[in-house]
């Protein structure tokens, strides 16, 4: 049997289990299981079907074994900010409510009435977004204060899945930083902040960094699955894992392109300046205790919703092809909250264009071009802000993640920014997840070797600005 490491990579719309192993100095990948991840309505909240997700992970492990693999480790990454609370008997007190649920409406303002925005940013360095864990906990405190008091464990989504696999409870560093409750400098829970907000500080676990080995599978799972291996912490925030896979960090900006677009640079220190606050940048934790100085903005969620509104009549590739030959010019502000979870994305786009006295898209190609144009303009604005903060011109943009396969958007980014775009690594998150596991068990020495392996294992494609003659 082929020994492998398993990356469980769960995004906001789908999850995969990917087997990875080194062969002749190259990283080989095989997807052994895939599943949809959709929100469900529980008790009038938009929630993740966390029990089903767990069962899908077990199915993925079985599938790997059925495909001739012998797993020696497993790591889980997911989206950020969402969590569950457990009681003293380790039973769930809360459902896995999604960041897309409107329960956090008005919660930022409520928190700011207790603690200043400036203090929050100076201490945590985290971008202000209404769905951050801090505001979810504030909403929960308002609606069910007894649940927070009863809670003995706060576990983010990957932490909880790790607990189900191993029986051990830890909070992983990269995802913990997205709560806006971790001190950017000490890298520990900000207990003063937590207690000032009236949250139960005893429910937070020790924060463990990527590469930490949690432990083996629970005995009953070993018996059920017929295998045992170490569960290891990658960067459990999917973007943290994706950034590990960026081949060059010097003089380059990355765009992790998926449901969300995360645009930034990697640092060895946080930037908690007034300008960074004004531009709403974040300092999320990264692997190797690095900082991901980035802005989290709208991504391909809009086109996913457009596809759904057209009753899945078109594939994603169809929208890119239609937009390529389209001259439609209208732009929407993709970061307007109205586009987070509208009843109908197409109608919301049309309404925005009408309200701003722009041409209203009618055909599928016009809607698609409007979305892609708007994303490219949003990227350009974020990149300009990064360069202003750093007082450096970054010549290169790495586009990684699922969106890197969109050649039309890659070219649009090059044309809009005037920079060289290097795209590839559509499986960047799984790659980064696997790389960290391999470093944890000494299959790879360090990040420098890891990035050399990545360079030699995967194809990258370069896009330059097209200059119109005449």
UniProtKB/Swiss-Prot annotation:
Protein's UniProt keywords contain ATP-binding: yes
> Is Transport among the key words of this record?
no
Say which enzyme class the record assigns.
Answer: transferase
Organism's domain of life? Answer: Bacteria
| E.C. designation(s) | 2.7.1.5
Which keywords, in A-to-Z order, does the entry hold?
ATP-binding, Disulfide bond, Kinase, Nucleotide-binding, Rhamnose metabolism, Transferase
Gene3D superfamilies documented for this protein: 3.30.420.40
What this protein needs as a cofactor is: Mg(2+)
Residues binding ATP, per UniProt: 12-16, 259, 304, 402
Residues noted as binding substrate in the record, renumbered to the chain: 80, 237-239, 296
Q: Which cysteines are joined by disulfide bonds?
A: 353-370
One GO term of the biological process aspect = rhamnose catabolic process
UniProt-listed InterPro entries: ATPase_NBD, Carb_kinase_FGGY, FGGY_C, FGGY_N, Rhamnulokinase
Per the UniProt record, one Pfam family is FGGY_N
Q: Could you state one GO cellular component term attached to this entry? A: cytosol
Known catalytic reactions: L-rhamnulose + ATP = L-rhamnulose 1-phosphate + ADP + H(+)
GO MF entry, a single one: rhamnulokinase activity
Q: What does this protein do?
A: Involved in the catabolism of L-rhamnose (6-deoxy-L-mannose). Catalyzes the transfer of the gamma-phosphate group from ATP to the 1-hydroxyl group of L-rhamnulose to yield L-rhamnulose 1-phosphate.
NCBIfam families in the record: rhamnulo_kin (TIGR02627)
Stated family: Belongs to the rhamnulokinase family.
Query: What is the protein's given name?
Result: Rhamnulokinase
Protein's gene: rhaB
């Amino acid at each position: 049997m082929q020994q492998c490491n398993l990356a469980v990579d769960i995004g906001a719309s789908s999850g995969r289990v990917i087997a990875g192993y080194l062969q002749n100095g190259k990283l080989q990948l095989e997807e052994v299981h895939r599943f949809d991840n959709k929100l469900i309505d529980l008790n009038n909240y938009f929630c993740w079907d966390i029990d089903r997700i767990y069962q899908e992970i077990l199915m993925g492990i079985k599938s790997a074994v059925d495909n001739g693999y012998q797993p020696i480790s497993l790591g889980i990454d997911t989206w950020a900010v969402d969590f569950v609370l457990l009681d003293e008997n380790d039973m769930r007190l809360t459902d896995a409510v999604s960041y897309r649920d409107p329960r956090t409406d008005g919660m930022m303002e409520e928190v700011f009435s207790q603690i200043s925005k400036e203090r929050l940013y100076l201490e945590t360095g985290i971008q202000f977004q209404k769905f951050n864990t801090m505001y979810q906990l504030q909403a929960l405190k308002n609606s069910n204060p007894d649940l927070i008091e009863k809670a003995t464990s706060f576990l983010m989504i990957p932490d909880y899945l790790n607990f189900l696999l191993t029986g051990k409870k830890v909070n992983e560093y990269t995802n913990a930083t997205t709560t806006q409750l971790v001190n950017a400098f000490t890298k520990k829970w900000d207990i003063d902040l937590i207690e000032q907000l009236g949250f139960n500080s005893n429910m937070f676990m020790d924060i463990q960094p990527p590469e930490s080995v949690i432990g083996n599978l629970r005995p009953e799972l070993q018996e059920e699955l017929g295998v045992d291996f170490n569960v290891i912490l990658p960067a459990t925030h999917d973007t943290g894992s994706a950034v590990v896979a960026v081949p060059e960090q010097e003089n380059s900006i990355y765009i992790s392109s998926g449901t969300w677009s995360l645009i930034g640079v990697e640092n060895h220190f946080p930037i908690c300046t007034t300008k960074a606050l004004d531009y709403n940048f974040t300092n999320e934790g990264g692997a190797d205790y690095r900082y991901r100085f980035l802005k989290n903005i709208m991504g391909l969620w809009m086109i996913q919703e457009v596809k759904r509104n057209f009753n899945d009549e078109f594939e994603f590739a169809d929208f890119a092809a239609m937009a390529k030959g389209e001259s439609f010019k209208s732009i929407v502000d993709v970061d307007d909250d109205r586009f987070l979870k509208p009843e109908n994305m197409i109608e919301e786009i049309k309404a925005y264009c009408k309200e701003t006295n722009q041409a209203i898209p009618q055909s599928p190609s016009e809607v698609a071009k409007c979305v892609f144009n708007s994303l490219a303009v949003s990227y350009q604005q974020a990149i300009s802000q990064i360069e202003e903060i750093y007082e450096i011109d970054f010549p290169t943009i790495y586009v990684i993640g699922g969106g890197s396969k969109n050649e039309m958007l890659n070219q649009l980014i090059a044309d809009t920014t005037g920079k060289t775009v290097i795209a590839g690594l559509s499986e960047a998150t799984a790659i980064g997840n696997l790389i960290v596991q391999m470093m944890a068990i000494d299959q790879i020495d360090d990040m420098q070797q890891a990035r050399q392996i990545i360079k030699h294992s995967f194809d990258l494609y370069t896009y330059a600005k097209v200059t119109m003659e005449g």
